[in-house]
A protein has these predicted regions:
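N-terminal secretory signal peptides
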Residues: 1-2, 172, 178-226, 407, ...
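Ferredoxin-type iron-sulfur electron-transfer modules and their immediate structural context
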Residues: 1-75, 130-138, 218-225, 233-323, ...
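Short, well-ordered coil/turn residues that connect adjacent beta-strands
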Residues: 56, 92, 349-350
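Iron-sulfur cluster-binding cysteine motifs and their immediate structural context
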Residues: 67-89, 95, 99-117, 327-344, ...
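Extended interfacial segments that mediate partner engagement and assembly in macromolecular machines
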Residues: 106-107, 123-163
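Polybasic, low-complexity binding patches
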Residues: 115-126, 373-385
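Intrinsically disordered, low-complexity segments enriched in serine and arginine
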Residues: 166-167
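C-terminal, charge/polar-rich interaction regions
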Residues: 301-306, 310-371, 382-396
Length: 421
């Protein structure tokens, strides 16, 4: 059923028309006089690209010569990444495409624009306030992005964990990628990385990602409830009236900022839960939770039913072959491996990123990588458990009170029948 058009919608449409009439010939005048408004943003693809910084500490190739990982060098379109003597060097001829950031399993390459949480928040802002949000690259868009368009240097810059969280929380997100736009692009691995990341995320989330290939199909329509809330907030600022008195439905809509803040709070609470439960090894080393894993764990915490769809790599331990040399513990970039006092190797699945370095450095071949589902990645939510417990107690109290009232009512009716006789 279509949403009923009311007085507030009419007022919003009128206000849009008034705003457009304030300076109707401004653009024509500027064009004739050659005036350039410096305050307005200008299209420059370089503004959406940045050279990644490098952290050699978690790099698998830097930690051990036995590592077979060279994912960053494999995806680099101009071969500017060099790893030698435990150090990573990015040459000045870097294209700033960001593919190395997405390819690195340990997040040794850092780009503030491409951090999984920042990408998620950018998509959340666009998808929460608009009917459809789009993720695209500078080569495809070739203009300043609108409010519902999230622009990255290359479409392959978004990881599978980020896509998984986006697909689960926002079904109204699509990728804009014109046909053959990647054919002549120098970022040769970008389209392939996008396909692999989205295909895995779609399997995990159990739903498909939208795709747009025509520029004319890109729409920028705000969701009705958020447009109304935006208008009501403007009235509050100008008149001081309470929004709930004007329209309670609008007051109940959570703002974009509030939704992002709630997600950040969930991620922080999840990290605190893990830190208190298993955040430190027996050698007093603090385990490291990558940003991509944070997003995945947060999504699985809210949607545990999706855990069976998730496929991840975990090391499997053979106690008979292990000599307790500790090589795997020293090599693990996130300190997920731990040698316990009883002579047993323990691997914390929530921190393990499945890089396989522990299996590669084990000279006794006591470790091998196997594929499992994500059931071990579901972290209990203490707040949700507390609320569920309170709800169960309230339900039990209600049932008890209902039974007591029913019993008293039955006795009263019996007394009335006796008096009638």
């Amino acid at each position: 059923m279509a949403e009923q058009h009311d007085m507030f919608d009419d007022i919003i449409e009128i206000s849009k028309g008034v705003d457009a009439l304030k300076n109707p010939f401004g653009g024509i005048t500027d064009a004739l006089l050659g005036t350039v408004d410096e305050s307005k943003p200008h299209w420059n693809p370089a503004d959406y690209k940045e050279r990644p910084r490098v952290n050699c500490i978690p790099c698998l190739a830097c930690k051990s010569e036995k590592s077979s990982c060279h994912a960053c060098m494999d995806v680099c379109p101009v071969s500017v990444i060099e790893i030698e003597d435990g150090a990573i060097d990015v040459l000045d001829s870097c294209r700033k495409c960001g593919l190395c950031v997405a390819a690195c399993p340990t997040e040794a390459f850092v780009s503030p624009r491409l951090q999984p949480k920042k990408v998620y928040d950018a998509v959340a802002r666009a998808a929460t306030a608009h009917e459809t949000a789009y993720v695209t690259c500078t080569r495809a868009l070739k203009r300043i992005p609108r409010e519902n368009e999230v622009l990255v240097a290359c479409v392959g810059d978004v990881t599978r964990e980020t896509w998984f969280s986006i697909l689960t929380d926002f079904p109204n997100v699509s990728v804009y990628l014109p046909l053959d736009i990647c054919a002549n692009c120098r970022n040769t691995c970008g389209e392939e990385m996008l396909g692999e990341a989205i295909s895995e995320a779609e399997e995990w989330a159990g739903r498909g990602m939208g795709l747009e290939v025509e520029p004319r199909d890109l729409k920028c329509n705000k969701r009705r409830e958020y447009e109304r809330k935006e208008f009501m907030d403007k009235i509050v600022r100008q008149t001081g009236l309470t929004v709930s008195k004007l329209t309670p439905a609008t007051a109940a809509v959570a703002s974009v900022t509030q939704r992002i803040r709630e997600h950040s709070s969930r991620v922080s609470a999840l990290e605190k839960t893990l830190n208190s439960a298993c955040g430190v090894t027996t050698q007093k080393r603090r385990r490291i939770l990558t940003q991509g894993r944070q997003l995945m764990l947060s999504t699985l915490q809210q949607h545990p039913e999706l855990a069976e769809n998730v496929r991840v790599q975990f090391p499997e331990f053979d106690h008979d072959r292990c000599t307790m040399c500790g090589a795997c513990v020293e090599a693990c970039p996130t300190f997920a491996c731990d040698l316990l006092d009883g002579g047993k190797l323990a691997i914390e699945p929530t921190y393990c990123i499945g890089c396989g370095l522990c299996a590669e450095v084990c000279s006794d071949h006591a470790l091998k990588m196997v594929e499992r589902d994500g059931s071990e990645l579901v972290v209990p939510d203490p707040e949700a458990e507390r609320k569920a417990k309170l709800a169960a107690e309230a339900k039990a109290e209600y049932a008890e009170a209902k039974a007591e009232v029913k019993q008293k009512l039955g006795r009263a009716l019996d007394q009335i029948e006796k008096l009638a006789d």
